[in-house]
Structures are given as structure tokens and as C-alpha cells.
Amino acid sequence: FSVGVALPIAPVTLHNYLADGDLVLVAANGGVNFYIGNNPESDGITAVVPGTRADRWGGQEDQVRIAREALGDDQATARQISEFWYDRGWKYILSDSMGAARHTAYKAFILINAHEVSNNRVIEFVTRHSQIYTLATLRFWVILPLATAGLVIGGGRRQLKSLLVIFLVVYSATLIPFFINARFRLPLAAILIIFAASAVVTWY
């Protein structure tokens, strides 16, 4: 199992080390994404660091500049920059634990909400102007209730169901601390559809 997990990741880690001289497992944007989801101005869905430009490359330059200025090191590595933003996120959480807890609960609500939060595509715009896309898209507000019913009344092997439920819980737990959008919760939908189908089969 460990070898199977390590094989696809190792080439990426090696590339990161050769390119930047820093041991980064896969990517070094976890810290900034954590701060985006855990700061006084976070709304749980907007993927922009407060005080930075909203466009992708401009925002990334600002994130690096702010971190390096605060660290007093204009050669700070990607890993050090990520650690800086993680630290700022944790400082917010520890300074306002109740507010952070309420915000985390709100992000959990967004995760199961019917609204599809756009990230790199404006989903509502596409569905308004494409009948094919509308008909071909099964919305989260349909999938989640059916999946819940499937978990309760559906058949299937208990061990397999348990593994799928564990995935749902663990993936959700790794997503909520950051910020929520439809693209990030898509892996949940893929598993929930299995349980939703189980409910439909049981009923019909």
C-alpha cells in the first residue's frame, strides 16, 4: 500500500527538489489556502487573500511578497512561505476560537448546501445558457438526500459501505479547514452518487 501511494508522488517531490532545492511533497500552496479559509475577512468561498490582487498571477506575486517581507527574507522558499501563511491562519484561530469555530461550522454548511459555488467556471451562467449541460448535470441538492436515504435503506456489503463513508468523512474533514467550492467537493459527489443509486434501486 505504501509503495502504491509513494510511486505517483515521488516524481513530483523529486521535481520540486531539483527545481527549487526545497523538499516539497506535492505543492506548497496549502498554507495560503489555509489562511484564505481562516482569517477575519474569510467568507468561506472566496479564493483571495485579503489585501492581494484578485487575479491569479498578481495575487500569487502579492502572497509571496507579503510573506517574504514579513519574514525579512527575500529568498524565502515556497515551503517557508507556505508555513508563514499556515502560521497566520493558526494565529487567527487561536485569537478568536469561538469565531473560528462558527466559521468552520458555516463552511461545513456550505459543503452540503444546494448552491454550487463557482471556482474556475461560473456554473450558474453555463446552466442558464446551455440546455444540454442543464439536463446532463445532476445537482448536489438531488444527490445528497438520495445518498442519505441510500445509506439508511440501501443494500450492499457493509464493509464496502464503511470504506466509502470513511472516505466521505475524511475528505470532508480535510476540505472544511480551507474554503469550499463545487470543484473541491466534486469527489464527494462521485461517492454520494453510489449511495443515491442504491436508494433508487431499493425503491424501484
Where are these regions (language model features)?
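Membrane-interface junctions at the ends of membrane-embedded or membrane-associated helices
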Residues: 1, 153-161, 193-204
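Central hydrophobic cores of alpha-helical transmembrane segments
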Residues: 1, 163-170
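Hydrophobic alpha-helical membrane-interfacial segments at the cytosolic entry of transmembrane helices
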Residues: 1-17
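Hydrophobic/aromatic-rich transmembrane helices and adjacent perimembrane loops
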Residues: 7, 139, 165, 173-174, ...
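Transmembrane-helix signature of polytopic, lipid-linked glycan biosynthesis machinery
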Residues: 10-14, 150-156, 167-184
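Membrane-proximal stem/loop segments at transmembrane-domain junctions that anchor or position
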Residues: 25-111, 115
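Membrane-interface anchor segments at the N-terminal boundary of transmembrane helices
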Residues: 91-164
